Amino acid sequence: MDIEIIAIGDELTSGRILNTTSSFAAKQLFEAGYEIYGMSTIGDTPEVIGEALKRSIERVDAVLVTGGLGSTDDDLTNEAVSRAFGLPTLPNLEILSIVRAHFAQITDAPVGQLEKLAWLPEGAEVFDPQSGMAGYQLIYEDKPIFFLPGVPHQMKALMVEHVLPRLATWHTHRHVSTFQRVFRIFNLPENEVNTRVSRLKLTNDVHIGYYPVFPEVHLSLLIRDTNPKTAKRLFDSSCRAIKTALGDHIYGYDRDTMSQIVGQALVKRGMTLAVAESCTGGLIAQKLTDMPGSSRYFLGGVTSYHNSMKTAFLDVPERLIEKEGAVSPEVAEAMAYGILEKTGADVTLSVTGIAGPGGGTLEKPVGTVYIAASTPHGDWVNAFQFKGSREQIRELSAQHSLDILRRYLLQDI
C-alpha cells in the first residue's frame, strides 16, 4: 500500500519551523509495513493545497496530510479540500458544541473564529471530537485521506491512536513482514562502506541505504516479504554478510550510541574508567554520563584546559609541557597516567589537541589531536589529524577516544 505525506504551512516552507511531523509519520508508517511514495511540504495556499491533493490521490492508495486545520486566517486546508473535490463544508455539531462550551472559556479569541474548527468538508469522519483536536478521515474515490493537525503532540497522538488502526483494517492493505536494522559504523568513510557492501552482490529484495550522520555512517537494511519465513531468512543472511564486510567498524545497531556500547563493555568486564580532557572540554565525560547508571563504571574526569590544571590536578611535569608542548604524545600519556593515579580506575583515557580555529602552527596545525589510554595491559598514544570546524574536531576527538576504548574492550583480555 503506497502512502504519500503532505505537510502544509508557510512556517514550514519558510524554514521558520522544522517539519518534524512528516518524519514521525513516515517512520510510523514504514515500521508498520507501508510504502512511502513521497513526502512534500507546501504553503498555506488553497490552490496549491488542492492541486497537491488531486495529484496524490491519483497515484497512491492513501494520503496523509498535516497542518492547516486550526482556527486562524491562515488555516486553509479544509477550504482547499472542499474546492478541490467539490464538497460543501458542513458544521460538525459535536465539535461546535465543544468549541462554544469549552474553548470560549480558556481563550480570548472570538467564538465565531473558533467555530471555524467545526466546519469540515462533507463526509469528514472526525477522529476524536471530544478532545477538541482537529483531525479527520475523508474517503475520496474509494481512497482514504487522513487530515491531522500540524501541532506535533496532537498529530502524533492522532497518528498512533486513529490513523494506524484505520489503515490496518483498510481493504487494500496486504500484510507484509518487515525486518529492518540500522548498522552504526564509525571510522570508515561512506564511500568505503558502500564499496564493501556492493561487493556482496545482495539480491534486489535487499534494500540498503547509506546515511552519513556526523561523525558516523548509518547503513539501513530493509527486507519485506509477504512470507515471514522467507523475509527472516534473507534478513539473517544479509546481516551476517554485512557484519563480515564491515567488521569491527560496526559498533552498534539501531539506537545504540558509542558511549552506551562502551559502558556495557565496561560493566561486562567489571572495569572502571576515568578521563582527562583538554581540547574536548568535558565532552567525553558528558557522553558517558548521558547514560543512566553510568556511575557503575565511570568514576569521573578532569577537564584540564589550562596547562596549570594539567600540572596541579594530573601531576603533568611543567618541564614536560615546556619541552614537548601541551599538545604532544608525551603530555597525553602523562595525563592518562595522572588521572589513573588520582582515581585508581582500571582504564583511563586522555585527549589533548588543537580544536581551532586558532592556535595551530606548521608543525602542529589545527586538528592535531593526541589520544592516550592507560590499561592493565599497557599504555599507548594515538595521533590524529582531524579536519573540520571547532565543534567537529571536538566531536571527532571524543568519539575516537571512546572508540579506542571500545576496541580495547573487544579484545580477548
Swiss-Prot record:
Transmembrane residue ranges: none
Database matches in InterPro entries: CinA, CinA-like_C, CinA_C, CinA_KH, Competence-induced_CinA, MoaB/Mog-like_dom_sf, MoaB/Mog_dom
Superkingdom of the source species: Bacteria
Pfam families: CinA, CinA_KH, MoCF_biosynth
PANTHER family on file: NICOTINAMIDE-NUCLEOTIDE AMIDOHYDROLASE PNCC, NMN AMIDOHYDROLASE-LIKE PROTEIN YFAY
Family: Belongs to the CinA family.
UniProt-recorded name of the protein: CinA-like protein
Organism: Desulfotalea psychrophila (strain LSv54 / DSM 12343)
